[in-house]
A protein has these predicted regions:
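Glycine-rich phosphate-binding loop signature in dinucleotide/nucleotide-binding domains
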Residues: 28-31, 79-83, 153-160
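Adenine nucleotide phosphate-binding catalytic loops in nucleotide-utilizing enzymes
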Residues: 1-70
Length: 184
């Protein structure tokens, strides 16, 4: 119907989601005149490019549970041309699956093609994540304490921070970010 749809979400996968929702609503015969307003008012939650403002740092939290999702996250981070810090948190609890071999299927070499001031690895499997990055010649900072990793980047980073987490790291990391956002 030649409708122009505007959305302020990063990540190409969001285009699919937005268009799928539009197509479903249109097929169901719903009124769509306010679709752009609904998109503008929508605030992603629970680690879906969720935004936090901590001191003078913009922080985006995003969930990555598998190679396809992680590669989409990397694409979303690449869309941002500004200097950035990146934290990658990987756990291996039951809900994540204890086999983390999937990390070798992620195109982490693409981190070289972005304006990353630093990459920090954290979480239960931070050593494995650091090794994975080493194999594609990407230096990383190892910080097992998640809150310290975030605080360090907020204090000494470039003011633009991406935090990429797998499932069991999401909720605890989100709580840390909410706590830090509330500190003055």
């Amino acid at each position: 119907d030649n409708r122009k749809i505007k959305a302020n979400y990063r990540g190409f996968y969001n285009v699919y989601n937005i268009l799928a929702a539009y197509a479903a609503a249109r097929t169901a015969g719903l009124e769509l005149k306010n679709y752009n307003k609904v998109l503008a008012d929508y605030n992603p939650q629970n680690g879906r490019m969720e935004h936090f403002r901590i001191k003078n740092t913009d922080v985006l939290l995003n969930l990555a549970k598998n190679p396809a999702g992680f590669n989409q996250n990397i694409s979303a981070v690449q869309e941002d041309d500004k200097p950035k810090d990146i934290i990658v948190l990987i756990n291996d609890r039951d809900q994540d699956g204890i086999d983390i071999s999937w990390l070798w299927d992620v195109d982490f070499d693409r981190f070289q093609d972005m304006n990353a001031a630093s990459i920090t690895v954290s979480g239960i499997r931070c050593q494995d994540m650091r090794l994975r990055l080493k194999y594609v010649d990407i230096p990383s900072i190892l910080e097992g304490d998640v809150e310290k990793a975030i605080r360090d980047r907020v204090e000494d980073g470039v003011g633009n921070l991406y935090v990429l987490v797998n499932y069991t790291a999401l909720f605890s990391t989100r709580n840390i970010l909410k706590k830090l956002e509330g500190e003055r």
